[in-house]
Amino acid sequence: MKRFFSVLLFCLGAAISGSELQLSSPRAIKVDDPEDPVQIFAAQELQRHLKMISGIEHPVGETEPATFVIGRKAPSDMERMNTGEGRYTFENNVLYFYGEDYYDRKRSLDKILADRDNRTGTLNSVYTFLDQECGVRWTAPGNDRIVFIPRNSVVLKEKKVNKWRLPLEFAFVRPYFWNPKLIAGNNKRVPEELRFSSSEVYRKRLEHIVWTRRMRLGANEIIRFGHAFTDYQDRFLKTHPEYLGMNQDGSRGLPDQLKNRVKLCVSNEAVVDQIISDWQANGAKKYLNVCPNDGTPGFCRCPRCLALDERRENERFLDHLTDRYVNFWNRIAAKAVKIRPDVTLVTYAYSYYRFAPRREKIQYPENILLGLVPMLMEDNRRIMEEWRKAGVRHFFLRPNDLCYEAVYFRGFERGIWEQFSAARDIGLNGMDFDACIGNPATELDFYIAARAMTKPQMSFEEIEKEYLSIYGSAAPVAKKFYELYRRNGDKMMRKVYRKLKQEKRYLLDSGQIPIVIQEKINFYYPVSLMREASALLEETLQYASELNESERRHLARLKSLNDHSIMTFELVEALNRKAADIEEKRNKLLKYRIQHKDLGFCWPLLFTRPRAEGNLKIR
């Protein structure tokens, strides 16, 4: 998208001394290893963006001499690279892009890019150049959401080695919303006009994966974590049922449909020995994943596990299970460090064991990496500080803030940044957002999250300004639009929080929000605010003659998204009160969705998932 900032370019050119790399005529892009799919992709990405910026197509090939070289270290750069690091260096009229890479070149490109353990330092060097030297911004997945500053040249310092490495050990946003299997299973449950072909799903999924790479998300080191005991029921229910959590009726294990969420009898020392044995059989790697399986059923109620709890008077069984788990982790660590002193146990503080322990302390603080899964609307800074007092020195965050699947703008972008900022100030090793990329109502949320993780020094206002640059001269109007929703966002979230608390439930996942608000939507969302937001955009579209075609298109899309949310609100509100005009509103909404299929929603999942509209039966 074109942005003419001639004054800015003049100031930049005057302030920087260096060599000017001309982009106004075709210059060759050479791939150092033509068998490497990521190097080829890096060259294609450089070519694509340079054409946007300069209007010139720079050819990709193997011919010499080349102006841009992908995958070859600059001759003067003798320094060893860190894992995941990307560098670019301008030397003797050649711009070298290179980095520390870790992936299997025999795999297909999409699989390499999708595997978050793969390190793509060379690709990151291209994106760092485009970000830092060319002002490119990837506001959302897709090439039509790229913002750039047109230019005919770039000024670079001779032999300056420009380095970039992820400031956290890992930073992820999980891009699994456009899941081919999920969509294929639900395609037939939506109107034919809103179904997606397998090729469309593949394209959208790749767009989302590429966006995470463009934002330079990934890892500097392979640290495996996640539900660690999903196979324990299959492995041990018949031979060692005592390994599994005891239910209230004295039985062990869970129903088959929940077996991958089975809990362990954490007081049983044989369970510790089994975990150590499995770890050794797998090579006793540095990181030992002991993250408990989540979900409510199955926490062990045997006398010995109950004796490990530090429960206060009048507390329910599930109110505080942390002490049993800290005791469990300490016992695992005690045996693991004897085998490998630098081992790191990776685990979660989540749901009923997210608060710091009351009795236990972390006995091996250098050997524990704790993933805090924060609850929305909680004082997570205080929770992290209490865990620090219990002995934890190494944290990562694993929020569910981006699992929101409803079509309504929720106004929680600043909350996401503030949560990150609190963790950053206390000390943060990494961050892993469980997420549903693909909801256009949360594009700003995703940009805030991704940019904060890769540029943690940026303020909320700076990141928001970058995102809003997609609207060009209409950015102030778009800013006001989001501020309108932010005005209601905190109130809405607190209402949801209180509602769940009354029902003795927790707001652990933003996917819970649509389920709650759609039971009584006009209590949570003032439709007057939604209409005010649309009127603001409509007035700008009608009377702002200075908008160019691209700015007008993006602003019109924002209005269409908001109009769509109003129509959805009206239908849900009619369903809530069993109104006579439900069918009329349903048909109106379906017609609008068919006319606006390309708004960006994953319709088969929006219609069918309970976290979206599955409970409403909108079709």
What are these regions (language model features)?
Residues E45-E57, F129-V136, D278-N282, K335, ...:
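Structured segments of extracytoplasmic/periplasmic soluble domains
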Residues P37, A42-E45, H49, E85-R324, ...:
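Feature activates predominantly on carbohydrate-active enzymes
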Residues I16-Y88, V147-K160:
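Acidic, contiguous N-terminal accessory segments
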Residues N162, S198, E315-R619:
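Substrate-binding groove of N-acetylhexosamine-processing glycoside hydrolases
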Residues A74, N293-G298, Y350-P357:
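Short, internal active-site loops enriched in acidic
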Residues F4-G13:
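Sec-dependent N-terminal signal peptides
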